[in-house]
């Protein structure tokens, strides 16, 4: 069976001319996740325009985020940064009374070298609201990496001891060294993954981030930590280096294969023998058969924009798809080591070529390759989706994978629901015989 | 610094990109950090564009901060020249890149030595002008560039056409109902026997710009884009222009009369009065509609208007003059055009508001409590919250404001569309009366037995909480599926475990 056609993983790096969301977009899901927070994005009209358009209707629901829009006086340092931020934060405190204010630094604050990290502690002491600074800018990061910068900053704020000894019970009863998971997930998914581990006798003593800033988990030296998303390498580094925790390097719980591998790795570190995992995985695969039969033997091309690409490619390979290319904004080979190993093992197992991983892709070149390869499905950003559809190529917007629930056994079906949707829809349309809708070549 | 949740007009480079991407074979390169190419998403999503948006970024990253972006920008311009062979490449700075104070003009000059295409640097200041002003300026810049070029090659077509002809200036990508408006204008000019010389910038070629002066006059349908170009052409080539927006019956007539006066002054002998009368009374439905008894119910109803200068002014006039509606206040976010706006609407409303602060507009609406709002998508959402109907009449807009069907706001068909929009925004006349007489809708509770009420399945407190977290529009389905699953495996308490088991096993 496993006559491996592939040797090692091949990595390429292109020009970085690709479309992705600005990392400040993390504000849109993090403000909903952290219920007592307020996010202040310190930037220009361009940042604000992106947020208001990308977040669509959400903007009208009185969001707990706003722009501190820089004006000419701020750029030329005619105005005093401290005074300006103080004025705005006092107003936010008065209007919303949050438990924490996040300052999201942008490209502009980087270029004019506004000392947010220096100002924050002083202002925090003065107005008595915690201020956490994250530099989620487009000079350094792409899309989901924004969350990474915020969580890395939050990791420093996790308490060393519980203030209230009475709710210490969960830690005391834990039969193993405490485990803290990191990555922002919708509450139902948090519950699902926590329960999945509980079945194996593993207790999650906290999540970074928690539902409220005031409930950030205790993180002490020697604790174990595990990531749930592939784009959290800075957070992982911070937890290891600054908080002296031990990182469990595992594939990510995306797809039944990933979820099982994730749990198994955690169990092995905790010296727990996993029970019933194999059967559970099998049952999930069986329940997915109706969707898998639609994509088995088909090909997929990831243009790359959100760093979930390797995990999704690995899952889709296991579903029987051929992956032509994995475009990805940034590849941390250390943090994703276990995921990359599982990708390789999956390719061997399914007897398919290892796809090329293209870091910092060049969208123009990619469209050329897509024309040559004619994949059955292209997973891409919204800038390219309609033009590709008009040329008869099935596409799925990559952004949906970041907003849908895709983690754990329970949500494997949701990933396939997304992946198969264009195929299911276009199957009926192709019978009409109009595949190309553009007069350009 | 300004605390801002929402803005009516976007940053300057968006205006430049809207102009550049409207022309054929013009490619824009943004000097911008990763993620600033959101314009491509808007084109592709809102306009459902079938083709790749001709905009790429020359990405500003850490390396650029350290070393400058000269090589990169020049390389990106020459690369696009090879790949797409455009007629023109426009380099546009963004908010971020403009503070780097690199000599972009120098890069443009250097690149243009190596390119087949012309190369221009968009002349916009990100901290002083907004999207609309930048668009106006960029169009003028491109037209000026090609007119100057044609002049030095002696290629300007100054010979006027034999019969009256016009250039329509200001049809722009991502403009509010622009494409429909332009189609309607073409029809109008055809009716008036005026030949259309050129329509710019949408779908135009920069190579044809040298033919602009052969038209008798220029027509500027929207205040926001085209005026600067019209003034340039007036100064350089002595071309007159008409800038009365033909929106509404009265203004359309005023616009046509102004055209008549203009072409007659240039030697034509036309009389459009009969055409105006025929269109107004018998072809367009809206004048008759205003007169019909149904429309009487709108008399004196209170409305407010907010939008860009063109649309807010025109709609205010229509509501007041043509429909007898009381406009409590009308406003615009085009602060730079305040004087013109006030002058236009002063006599048609109680108060004029000029502000780009949506919080202030929201508060004012709440205080005014109008029967209907005519505004942008922002006012629509304010209306939703206050339970006041809203007709969307101006950008900024969402995807539903890019309708597939024919919906012009300009010309005689436009008057029909606007009449429908206004009428449908108010609670219908008769319904209104009946509700008043009978004191609201029938409130007797409908007798119905829900499926889930048949047998008793209990939800644990935890599961119930989880259920409540599920968004409202799918909650019912999840509840039914879960209960069916529990019933099928004879469980009468739904716990979190049961809930997720159901999700895994019941294929939705």
Swiss-Prot record, chain A:
Molecular function terms, GO-annotated: 4 iron, 4 sulfur cluster binding; ATP binding; metal ion binding; oxidoreductase activity, acting on iron-sulfur proteins as donors; oxidoreductase activity, acting on the CH-CH group of donors, iron-sulfur protein as acceptor
BP terms from Gene Ontology: light-independent chlorophyll biosynthetic process; photosynthesis, dark reaction
Protein origin, superkingdom: Eukaryota
Cofactor binding comment, as recorded: Binds 1 [4Fe-4S] cluster per heterodimer. The cluster is bound at the heterodimer interface by residues from both subunits.
Residues that coordinate or bind [4Fe-4S] cluster: 22, 47, 107
Tagged with keyword Glycosyltransferase: no
Record-given protein name: Light-independent protochlorophyllide reductase subunit N
Name of the encoding gene: chlN
UniProtKB/Swiss-Prot annotation, chain B:
Main location: plastid
CDD domains: Pchlide_reductase_B
Chain coiled-coil ranges: none
Pathway(s) of this molecule: Porphyrin-containing compound metabolism; chlorophyll biosynthesis (light-independent)
Molecular functions per Gene Ontology: 4 iron, 4 sulfur cluster binding; ATP binding; metal ion binding; oxidoreductase activity, acting on iron-sulfur proteins as donors; oxidoreductase activity, acting on the CH-CH group of donors, iron-sulfur protein as acceptor
GO process terms (BP): light-independent chlorophyll biosynthetic process; photosynthesis, dark reaction
Signal peptide: none
Binding-site positions, [4Fe-4S] cluster: 36
Cofactor list: [4Fe-4S] cluster
GO CC aspect terms: chloroplast
Reported function: Component of the dark-operative protochlorophyllide reductase (DPOR) that uses Mg-ATP and reduced ferredoxin to reduce ring D of protochlorophyllide (Pchlide) to form chlorophyllide a (Chlide). This reaction is light-independent. The NB-protein (ChlN-ChlB) is the catalytic component of the complex.
HAMAP family associated with the record: ChlB_BchB (MF_00353)
Assembly with partners or alone: Protochlorophyllide reductase is composed of three subunits; ChlL, ChlN and ChlB. Forms a heterotetramer of two ChlB and two ChlN subunits.
Family: Belongs to the ChlB/BchB/BchZ family.
Protein name: Light-independent protochlorophyllide reductase subunit B
Lineage start: Eukaryota, Rhodophyta, Bangiophyceae, Bangiales, Bangiaceae
